[in-house]
Amino acid sequence: MFTLSDFDFNLPPELIAQTALPDRTASRLLEVDRSVEPARLVDRHFAELPSCIAPGDLLVFNDTKVLKARFFGQKASGGKIEVLIERVTGTHTALAQIRASKSPGAGTTLRLADAFDVTVGERVEPFFTLHFPAPCLDLIEQYGRLPLPPYIEHDPDATDETRYQTVYASNPGAVAAPTAGLHFDQPLLEQLDALGVERATLTLHVGAGTFQPVRVDNIAEHKMHSEWYDLPQSLVDKIAATRARGGNVIAVGTTSMRALEAAARSADEAGRPLAATQAETDIFITPGYRFRVVDRLVTNFHLPKSTLLMLVSAFAGVETIRAAYRHAIEERYRFFSYGDAMLLTRRDTPEAPGA
């Protein structure tokens, strides 16, 4: 069995990208070519992506939009609090993490951004229900702060408000960006269209749990966070058409991957074909998982000991990912949300846990 230490690596801190590059497509792209063994590592720039994809392939994007989900405020007693909205659950309600010297009880009033009051409702572990005095999304957009990842050391600014969103973000609800999509700009999307590459979207609202490291040595004991996704019928139809013409389904980001594979696994378990789905998923993809939909994956470089590093290791092979990450560190690639990208191809047979 694989253990947590199998997914650890030492990253020089200066390789953690703190800001976005001036141009989205200026990022580097490490292509992991599995047509040979061992896999060949090809250093590219992201603008070269169209040369790596064939006409008739399908790119699947996550169109979630990052909320300005972080608030600073205070209790009626004057005690300082920090609130991170995890999920909007209704027009006037949301689930949130609350940092405070003492957890607020139900019925407590909290003042946020020195602008409005929310009331604490029932606890839904590990979150608190918050009741807003006006539509949540309006207040979040007007008064909230962009929740940059914990490893980005500057406060969010106007540049982040543009660059920590994809150009196609349209469904508000995430508290972290689907970062593989940050490399695409409109000219690149139009270039892909002109080449005959198909595009489709789904929605998965990325939760703060995406940054949580695994803390148990036996990774099978890890409790995965849950996220909501919407896989529309139009995407199901495009996947079927792509399969019929022999094209590849290419997930743009691990969030697109998780939604696609969650829906496909549920369909398999129910003995039916892939169908339009709106559901929660806590799918935890580790080596040994049998991929059902995704053939290739565009993804950024992930944190040590993270569930996403385990996912890409399951997809491309543990040793392949180790070699790719060693190469990326030697070649000074930029890591994490504002960093560079990889293009991976699925390992043909699932890797047995511990193999």
Curated annotation (Swiss-Prot):
Q: In which pathway does it act?
A: tRNA modification; tRNA-queuosine biosynthesis
The molecular function terms in GO held by this entry are: S-adenosylmethionine:tRNA ribosyltransferase-isomerase activity
HAMAP family per UniProt: QueA
Q: What does this protein do?
A: Transfers and isomerizes the ribose moiety from AdoMet to the 7-aminomethyl group of 7-deazaguanine (preQ1-tRNA) to give epoxyqueuosine (oQ-tRNA).
Organism from which the protein derives: Burkholderia cenocepacia (strain ATCC BAA-245 / DSM 16553 / LMG 16656 / NCTC 13227 / J2315 / CF5610)
Where the protein is mainly located, per its record?
cytoplasm
Q: What is its EC number?
A: 2.4.99.17
Reaction catalysed?
Answer: 7-aminomethyl-7-carbaguanosine(34) in tRNA + S-adenosyl-L-methionine = epoxyqueuosine(34) in tRNA + adenine + L-methionine + 2 H(+)
Kindly list the biological process annotations in GO that this record carries.
queuosine biosynthetic process; tRNA wobble guanine modification
Q: Name one GO cellular component term.
A: cytoplasm
**Protein name, per record:** S-adenosylmethionine:tRNA ribosyltransferase-isomerase
Q: Which Pfam families match?
A: Queuosine_synth
Subunit details: Monomer.
**What are the entry keywords?**
Cytoplasm, Queuosine biosynthesis, S-adenosyl-L-methionine, Transferase
- Localization per Swiss-Prot or TrEMBL: Cytoplasm
